[in-house]
């Protein structure tokens, strides 16, 4: 273990079991042992900073959120890469043509312009409830780090038509 300097961990399905919805004691002890041996431990997730759970007794050295678009540690922001405003607007329009609501996320807030089962199911993975936001237009004006749309693969191409500053990151 002496050559290892840093370790990265996803949350959903890695640190937190999909069925149990919590971190096991064995996982917590392992993370603490890594830190005790001088190995930096970091979260690497598609989640927003506000939805990263706190794990009692575990202090992470850094957080890579929004699939790496917003990275920070205790001292502040390390990297901040937002989606270009014109791409946010275009993606929202494209989703509307497909009759799909979207959820936009800043580093501090998220909000949706509607509700549908696919998007609600995605939110449930992170123990969140999808609700339409009265602040959607303000949030969509940016800065936006992530846009979530509960769409099947066959809708990826029309959803992303004309988008140059963002790409789909999907696992579910």
Feature names for model-found ranges:
Residues 23-25:
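A short acidic/small-residue loop/turn micro-motif
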């Amino acid at each position: 273990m002496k050559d290892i300097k840093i370790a990265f961990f996803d949350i959903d399905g890695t640190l937190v079991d999909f069925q149990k919805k919590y971190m096991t004691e064995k996982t917590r002890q392992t993370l603490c042992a890594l830190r005790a041996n001088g190995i930096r431990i970091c979260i690497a997730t598609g989640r927003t900073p506000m939805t990263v759970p706190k794990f009692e007794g575990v202090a992470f050295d850094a957080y890579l959120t929004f699939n790496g678009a917003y990275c920070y540690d205790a001292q502040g922001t390390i990297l901040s890469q937002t989606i270009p405003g014109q791409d946010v607007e275009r993606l929202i329009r494209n989703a509307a043509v497909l009759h799909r609501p979207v959820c936009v996320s800043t580093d501090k807030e998220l909000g949706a312009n509607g509700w549908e089962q696919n998007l609600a199911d995605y939110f449930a993975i992170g123990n969140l409830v999808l609700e339409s936001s009265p602040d959607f237009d303000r949030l969509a004006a940016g800065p936006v780090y992530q846009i979530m749309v509960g769409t099947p693969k066959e809708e990826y191409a029309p959803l992303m038509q004309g988008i140059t500053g963002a790409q789909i990151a999907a696992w579910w």
